[in-house]
Amino acid sequence: MNTATGFIVLLVLATVIGCISADFQGGFEPYEEEDAERIFRRSPTCIPTGQPCPYNENCCSQSCTYKANENGNQVKRCD
C-alpha cells in the first residue's frame, strides 16, 4: 500500500468514526416543527406607497388602487 492509498483509507475511517460519534451525541436528530418555523420565519414587511402591489394586505397603507404607469398602462399600486 502506498502513501496516497493509506491516506485515503485513514480519511475514510476518520469520516466513519466522526459520523458514528455525531449520531451518539444527537447530531443527526431531526428538527422539531417549532425549530423549523423559527429558522425559516420571515419578519413581516409591507410594500411602501407607490410600489406595485399584488394584494391589498401587503401594502403598508392596506390600500391598493389602479394608477397609470410611465407607459400609460393601468397597474395596481399601494396608496
From Swiss-Prot:
| Similarity section | Belongs to the neurotoxin 08 (Shiva) family. 01 (omega toxin) subfamily.
What is the top-level taxon of the source organism? Answer: Eukaryota
Instruction: List the protein's name.
Output: Omega-hexatoxin-Hi1b
Gene Ontology terms, cellular component aspect?
A: extracellular region
Taxonomic lineage is: Eukaryota, Metazoa, Ecdysozoa, Arthropoda, Chelicerata
Q: Where this protein primarily resides, as one coarse class?
A: secreted
Keyword Transmembrane helix set for record: no
- This protein's UniProt keywords: Calcium channel impairing toxin, Disulfide bond, Ion channel impairing toxin, Knottin, Neurotoxin, Secreted, Signal, Toxin, Voltage-gated calcium channel impairing toxin
The leader peptide range reads 1-22
This chain's function reads: Inhibits insect, but not mammalian, voltage-gated calcium channels (Cav).
Task: Site Critical for insecticidal activity: list residues.
Answer: 52, 69, 77
Q: Which SUPFAM superfamilies match?
A: omega toxin-like (SSF57059)
Got any disulfides in this one, which pairs?
A: 46-60, 53-64, 59-78
Q: What Gene Ontology molecular function terms does this protein carry?
A: calcium channel inhibitor activity; toxin activity
Organ and tissue specificity: Expressed by the venom gland.
Q: What is known of its domains?
A: The presence of a 'disulfide through disulfide knot' structurally defines this protein as a knottin.
